[in-house]
Amino acid sequence: MSTRDHVKQSPMPVQEGYPRSSKEFSPPSSRSRKRTWVRNLTMSLLIAAGAATFSKYIFPLGSILGAGSLQPIDPHDYAARADRILSTTPLIDGHNDLPYLIRLETKNKIYDHEKLPFEAGLLSHTDAKKIRQGKLGGQFWSVYVECPADPSAGIDDPSWAVRDTLEQIDVAKRLVDEYPDLLEYCETASCARSAFKKGRVGSFLGIEVHDLGVRYITVTHNCDNAFATAASTVAAGKPDHGLTDFGREFVKEMNRLGMLIDLSHVSHQTMRDVLSVTNAPVIFSHSSSYALSKHLRNVPDDVLRTVTKNGGVVMVTFVPLFLKVNDPASVTIHDAVDHILHVAKVAGWDHVGIGSDFDGTAVVPKGLENVSKYPRLVELLLERGVTDEQARKLVGENLLRVWSKAEDIAYAIQASGQKPNEETWSGRKWTAAADIPMPSMFNDSAERRKQLE
């Protein structure tokens, strides 16, 4: 059993000496009544003193447990309930494109606070003030780069993708370091919880490099790669081939590393293929319900049911086109609520989360204009009958459970002695400098080198 598993307390045993019936009870003497009174008074004083000491050191955990959070709340005071939920459970957003917006508008320069007034306020969806107003508890910062401009470019063709990805990882980490009172860089689920208890927003990276701190990989973006078919490819009328043979090996290696597999942006067949291969729960970092809006970026109900079996989580996005493909201009916060409730109805409350895509879309729903609006979203869900416990699962507990489970599976795989995967994709090109004299490792080295040409 993982050390992360909650320890279940056994039922309280029946205490010996208690009368089993009224017939076994005999009134105490006056002397015993006096001893009992003194003993009870002493115990009451000790308990009161202990409680005061306990509350002194435990309750003031930053913004986590304020004195008012333990007071009863009117069940119809949805705003107060939402506030308490977000003060005690980290709301973790699965996808925010602020690092890419910084790239576009400041060329990744963040230290001049007049040119990038992150603390004073930005016109876009995310800044320090909005984060505090929205009670954000954790954020996966997207460090993606775009697909090549030339659609015919293959995976072996030279491009700037690796360079730019490394730059995006760098700027995201520097942004976190620049605002240490607000943000805290994390690579584990336990760190995310710890940061929240300190009143900081756990900050995680989402793309494709584990040793550089990245903790989830979106299998494709808006173009196919060596691993799988993208949703945009199918939307363009091309075949849905799903996961490639190399993609299957890729999934196994992600399981070994403990990286979360993100199925947003992939085709429907890729979703099904990955779910048939992975040993770890998956995430959809920013997708919604296909049953409610027939956009190929959304998740069909049969996949939602498979996610339930897999143990994963679908994090509902706020992109209007995904919420109402036939009328995106009319989308409001209530449409986001509808998608959350549908995913919860089909997959269960253990398998739904929030993945806004703030700062990655020019248009947002009315009522969900930026990061500060999370409390209102939770409030509306409570008005629709969602329980506090269900809301806690939605805002962060589900994602943290999935993350911890992926880590546990990786520990087990690595403890078994499984080596890193050495497979490569079909048609992989290798290059070698033919004019540089090198020693030979084998008798047939010359033939081996010709195969690289």
Swiss-Prot record:
Give the source's domain of life in one word: Eukaryota
What name appears for this protein in its UniProt entry?
Putative dipeptidase UREG_03382
Q: Which residues bind substrate?
A: 221, 297, 357
* One GO cellular component term: membrane
Has keyword GTP-binding?
no
Query: What reaction(s) does this enzyme catalyze?
Result: an L-aminoacyl-L-amino acid + H2O = 2 an L-alpha-amino acid
Which cysteines are disulphide-bonded?
Answer: 147-223
List the EC numbers from the record. Answer: 3.4.13.19
Q: Which residues are involved in binding Zn(2+) 2? A: 208, 265, 286
Q: According to its UniProt record, which cofactors does this protein need?
A: Zn(2+)
Gene3D superfamilies, alphabetically?
A: Metal-dependent hydrolases (3.20.20.140)
